[in-house]
Amino acid sequence: MHIISAIYSARVQNCAAPTQPLVPSCQTHSAASHTPPGPSARLPSPARPEASTRTQGKSHAGAAAAAVEGTAAPEDEAADNSSEEDAGPGSHGEGAGEGGGSGTWPGNGGGPQPIHRCAGSVVAGATRGGCVAATRLYLAAVQPSGGLSICANTKPRAGPDPGSDSSEDERPNRNTVGNVPLVWYKDEEHIGYDIEGARITKAQRKDRLQQLLDRNDSKKALRTIYDPYNDEEVTLSKEELAMVMRIRAGQFPHLEVNPHETEHTWFTDPRDAEVMPIVDRPEPKSRFVPSKWEEQKIVKLVRAIRKGWIKKTPEQEEEERAAGPPAYLLWADDGLTDEAAAKAGSGLTYIPAPKLQLPGHADSYNPPAEYLPTEEEVAAWQMADPEDRPKALPQAFTSLRAVPAYTDFIKERFERCLDLYLCPRVRRKRLDIKSPEQLVPQLPKPRDLQPFPTTLALAYEGHMGPVASIAPDPWTGQWLLSGGQDGTLRLWEVRTGRCWRTWVLEGPVSAVAWCPQAGLRLVSAAVGNCVVLLPSGTGPEEAEEAAAEALRVRGPGRGGGRWVRGGPEEASSSGAGLAVRLRFPVRSLAWHGRGDYFASVAPTGNTQAVVVHQLSKRASQNPFRKNRGRVVRVAFHPTKPFFFVATQNHVRVYNLAKQALAKKLLGGGGVLSCLALHPGGDHVLVGSDDKRVAWYDLDLSTKPYKALRYHSAPPRAVAFHRSYPLFASAADDGTVQVFHGMVYADLLTNPLIVPVKILRGGHTVTASEGVADCAFHPTQPWIFTAGADSKILLYCN
């Protein structure tokens, strides 16, 4: 209890620091001269800062000596001490709880013993965390003589700023009786007096039952103590409990105190010469460069050994002859012994042999009758190949003693020895798959990948037969070009759905395309054996004049086609055009990005299946003397001199600058039907008759990166968007599949392909034909579709 009281006293001193500089003040009082407190008791006067100023520098050694001897101090020192008595909260009138003043302590003799205390030392120790006051009070409590003398003439430490407003006297109901026996107040209703002289009434104590209930209900009951001097219950903190335990164990109250500090032998340790050398300049560069002189010596030794000038001694030759060739374990790890290699779980070469499989329920010697094979099953087992049939058939025996020896025991052991001897061992990492959903790649949700076309917005009706091909203008997307089996070429206004112009041609239109050159505004169409070039009439006057000049024939033309004027004019309703007549029916067209070259594909043309035409020179040429396979589609690379030729089984990539085959993309099992290039030029979409759409990454491999099979019928067309990460495929099942295809600039990141929308219900399947073509709007996330039901539909976001 003394220790806990000391801890609490130190904590109170630490919480309420004095407001004036502390000075050493020592007085001696005896229990006989102390009268019980009452209304007439002398109360401490208010703090006077000038008192501490007067007592600065006074020596209190005499007072300390007088207190120890039990005599009074000299008069002059007593006067000084009387002035110090009113100095402030550090005076004797505030009781032992504040670390100042003097009182009585029960000693071994049974009566009150004189107590001598230095207020400055105790309070200064309290400001350092309470450890000094707690230690001194504890030492005083355990002294055999029972007396307490803690005046070590230590230098006082300056307290807080005198101008501070904080003071311990402001604490209400503060007990100022001092460290006197509480038995004096045993029969009184009060315990001490406050700073105003009023009695401090005792608090109502709890009975035993209430104390027992509080101890069971509260977790803080075991570390709650009763302070009899202030008549209150105090809960000790964890730090204070640790301090009490350390004091009881005879240790320092605080862990920060190190009784065995490291001794520094500055300039006396002989090792200091190594740490602090006399010369500490940086190492020269020559220390880090191989020595040339050592290299010359090594070269001389090597030359002498090669020429036989340096020979081994007879003793060395005899030792090598006796040792023989070095022997080592072939399958052991380098640098490891046999035991270490056997114990190494992650060895480089050693892998323990797999254990034999334990017998299961199928090897039971007396299985149920329904598990025994019939005669037909036995005959089938005997006729089957030994590698495909089970090792043994179930048999029934009356007891385990009747089971004969296993006939294939030696054979199986021999095969196991062969496996251990010849077959390499491989560690297979087992996949920790908790659920099948972990095998499915985590794709983003479609609503997070918007915008993409979702809703049918407009229908363009006017064709009298199936629409074979469509193409929006590549600049503004204001106009849409379409060609159908009814022999008409129509130009539509996208926003209104009005047919702005119609050309009636000689036969069915199989393909349409715009010239990419913005200053011409030409349209092209494949009609039978001809490729027709017509002015669109949608541009300004300068574009119309440039188109008329481009369509003027300057020469007879040469190469694989015959350039004529007036052919389309005879079958057109307005305007003059230009036609390139070929030998075989044309099925598709492809323009170069600059708008001067375009290629036509005639699948039945054999050696003239692919013809490249130049508009500025009116020339046509056949780039291939021999085609390996039937050509289906062609395309120009948007930025590089590459030419893509899709046959029924492969996609060949030719370098036009080197006139050589650059790459060959391998197809699947189906016949290729459509082709599309990514605007970046590094990715290719190919549709085939096996209902698949293959995505090729030219920088990754010649095999498909992804094979998408979402259609129930062969795809007829594929298309990329020019500005949005979208691509689509149209098939004969009447649906259009829209995908999110993000291509990253980082070559180490694979493209992200996510199906986002299925556009269905717009087209009707007619004669096993559904959607014939699809094309994206050049600037908006819209898509145009053309079907065999003579409809052209626009889907918007």
UniProtKB/Swiss-Prot annotation:
Keywords: Nucleus, Repeat, Ribosome biogenesis, rRNA processing, WD repeat. GO terms for molecular function: ribonucleoprotein complex binding. It comes from the Eukaryota. Residues 74-87 have a biased composition (Acidic residues). Residues 61-73 have a biased composition (Low complexity). It is found in: Nucleus, Nucleolus; Nucleus, Nucleoplasm. Signal peptide: none annotated. One of its GO terms (biological process) is maturation of LSU-rRNA from tricistronic rRNA transcript (SSU-rRNA, 5.8S rRNA, LSU-rRNA). Residues 22-112, 149-177 are annotated as: Disordered. SUPFAM superfamilies: WD40 repeat-like. Residues 90-112 have a biased composition (Gly residues). WD repeats lie at residues 462-502, 504-544, 581-623, 626-664, 667-706, 710-749, 766-797. GO terms for cellular component: nucleolus; nucleoplasm; preribosome, large subunit precursor. Required for maturation of ribosomal RNAs and formation of the large ribosomal subunit. Belongs to the WD repeat BOP1/ERB1 family. This is Ribosome biogenesis protein BOP1 homolog. It comes from Chlamydomonas reinhardtii (Chlamydomonas smithii). The lineage of its organism: Eukaryota, Viridiplantae, Chlorophyta, core chlorophytes, Chlorophyceae.
